[in-house]
Amino acid sequence: MDNRTLFEMRSIVKAFSGVRALDGVSLAVRPGECVGLCGENGAGKSTLMKVLSGVYPYGTYEGEILWDGAPLRAHSVRDSEHAGIVIIHQELMLVQQLSVAENIFLGNEITKPGGRMDYDAMHRKAEELLARLRLTDVNVAAPVMNYGSGHQQLFEIAKALAKNARLLILDEPTSSLSAKEIEVLLSIIEDLKRGGVACVYISHKLDEVKRVCDTITVIRDGKHIGTRPAAELDINGIITMMVGREMTSLFPKVEHTVGDVVLEARNVTCWDVTNPNRKRVDDVSFSVRRGEILGVAGLVGAGRTEMVSALFGAYPGRSSAQVLVEGKPVKVHSPAQAIAHGICLVPEDRKRHGIVPLMGVGENITLATLAQYARGLRVDKGAELMTVDREIKRLRIKTASPALSIASLSGGNQQKAVLTKMVLACPKVLILDEPTRGVDVGSKYDIYQMIADLAASGVAIIMVSSELPEILGMSDRVLVIGEGELRGDFANQGLTQERILAAAIHAEPRLRAA
């Protein structure tokens, strides 16, 4: 690795309405080095990256930025990109209807004399860039929409390389990727490092940070906590720096008793929304007991989300199932019916299905239980506010006011609010679909504690997760779904990630717990 400093931020201060979002943060990166930037949601990572990438222009912050030893005064994103600094956002910025090549060169087109676009040159160059990323089977003239999220993430990197990126900022790059796609991406980042490209890697997945990063910088509450070689830190050490307190285990151990069967699902079947002849879930049956945490594992696209959506009456296509609650058959054709029978769901995509962005934090929290505060034709705002204040304190939801728009909260705090909303409905069965996706480690712990406490109180938990450590750390029993079928039903005693993956890909026969 080149020992000279490519990029350095010195004592950066950024304030909004007098409140410091960044308070003297420093960061340095060498050519071919990958620096992990860690911190809880709201710590200041996004603000720092906006300063770094030119979103917040020179003059709107205090401190100094050096590029190749000289002051860098970027007044726009284009200025930063011209210097060689490119950010790849968590939400991919590709135009789905345009071709792969058109996306790679969008805003950076190769033209012929006279100004017309040189498609032949762009296609050739796009193929060369993708070959650097081990993609040799891509039709660069085809629309981006023809390719999955794993390919699209690499198209974004190719787009950055087309701009001669020397510093690549990757913001939660694996949040929507499968385990196999993550392996490919991390190995490609290693290739880029060997080629001299520097990276800033932002992720809540600390195992990835440890694996791909050379050094780790932690910020907390807008302050620089420290920078250490990755080899000197274990995951618990990173967490301690991030949250400011020692956490001996991410997964809380709360004594709970598993009781009688509270929900039984028989022959759950879901047909594809666009192809009614294809089944997304095929004849899956299972049960969950009072006080039990049932983990549901499987590869991306296995049908887990479709299955739990059908149990909640929210699957958009055709579905069928026999559902029994406490031994009695119930009809669940809508979320309202499900909630009435004590079945609640915290959805996978909280931004689309979990929150109402324009409403306040408090309004979102009481949305499912508003009838409890009805006094004739009016709402008892005093009683509602008492509930909201109690829950905000209990779950440590960071908000300046319950009236503040929920869209202004970090992902972790939004998720806590969505969870609280459903818990207030007093569920017998609580279904959690990817409950900690995009959530920082401190909020994860709070959510895990809430799940464990709910199980201890007798609530049956069904937890869908793509994070196997989460499944193994929280579950009493694990279902494995593969290609819409039940591939395994395991007691979580001596269970390993390898065994779960083997069942998910059909590498061993269908198994059930003894």
From Swiss-Prot:
Q: Which domain of life is it from?
A: Bacteria
Q: Specify the species.
A: Ralstonia nicotianae (strain ATCC BAA-1114 / GMI1000) (Ralstonia solanacearum)
Which cellular components does GO assign to this protein?
plasma membrane
Keyword Magnesium listed? The answer is no
- Spell out the subunit comment: The complex is composed of two ATP-binding proteins (XylG), two transmembrane proteins (XylH) and a solute-binding protein (XylF).
Q: Read off the NCBIfam families from this record.
A: PRK13549.1, xylG
Could you say which enzyme class this protein belongs to?
translocase
| Family, as annotated | Belongs to the ABC transporter superfamily. Xylose importer (TC 3.A.1.2.4) family.
Q: Supply the PROSITE patterns for this chain.
A: ABC_TRANSPORTER_2, XYLG
Name the reaction it catalyses.
Answer: D-xylose(out) + ATP + H2O = D-xylose(in) + ADP + phosphate + H(+)
* Name this protein carries in UniProt: Xylose import ATP-binding protein XylG
| Keyword match Iron-sulfur | no
EC number of the protein: 7.5.2.10
Lineage, opening ranks = Bacteria, Pseudomonadati, Pseudomonadota, Betaproteobacteria, Burkholderiales
Which key words tag this protein in UniProt? ATP-binding, Cell inner membrane, Cell membrane, Membrane, Nucleotide-binding, Plasmid, Repeat, Sugar transport, Translocase, Transport
SMART domains the UniProt entry points to: AAA (SM00382)
Role description:
Part of the ABC transporter complex XylFGH involved in xylose import. Responsible for energy coupling to the transport system.
Task: Offer an example of a GO molecular function term for this protein.
Answer: ATP hydrolysis activity
Query: For binding ATP, which residues are annotated in this chain's numbering?
Result: 39-46
